[in-house]
């Protein structure tokens, strides 16, 4: 029997096994597993970096919130020498004055030079407040700023018909009346006219009254002085303090 097979008892038979149908599936599964593992290894550093970034951002936000809380807490218990923001200045604290008329002493009138009026600064409706002072016909400005300046002067006379005045030879009776608010500055040699008002009295009959009101805003400097000049001091109506007055206040 052994001889028919051509094999000796000392030899080992070798049999080649052919692969069966469908035996390539294990290889395909192994390739998919390797691809999935590769993707995981590639994505793992990205996921780790993203996690680290989110963690650091959260810690940073918590740190900033802690710093803000400490700053607010420090301000709450800050010492009194630190800067404190003062409230807006109230109008009642600003310099202001209102002067009323007093009886005037006639003075000699020079050409192109109008006499200045005297004022009451304490009695009746008159006052000076918050470092605004009155002295020797002048209002003294205590601090620089924008001021509203005003004055009303009421004139009165007995007759002002220009033709009759000229025919009678009475040159002391005016054809017009003038009021000027003047500023005097130590650094400037000449007075500055801030406001001027003029009215004709030729068309007015006997026993006439003429008020002239002036008012406007001006930028003034500390130390400036204000006064009111008139063309004829003898015609100023001083009978009532609400007819002739002068004032200024810081805006």
UniProtKB/Swiss-Prot annotation:
Site residues, Cleavage: 71-72
Location, primary (coarse class): membrane
Residues carrying the site annotation Important for binding TNFRSF6B: 187, 190
Residue ranges occupied by any THD domain in the UniProt entry: 95-251
InterPro entries listed in its UniProt record: TNF, TNF_dom, Tumour_necrosis_fac-like_dom
Residue numbers on the Cytoplasmic membrane side: 1-35
One Pfam family per UniProt: TNF
Residues in the Extracellular compartment per record: 57-251
A GO BP annotation: activation of NF-kappaB-inducing kinase activity
Any GO CC annotation of this UniProt entry: plasma membrane
Quaternary assembly: Homotrimer.
Function summary: Receptor for TNFRSF25 and TNFRSF6B. Mediates activation of NF-kappa-B. Inhibits vascular endothelial growth and angiogenesis (in vitro). Promotes activation of caspases and apoptosis.
Name listed for the protein in its UniProt record: Tumor necrosis factor ligand superfamily member 15
Native source species: Homo sapiens
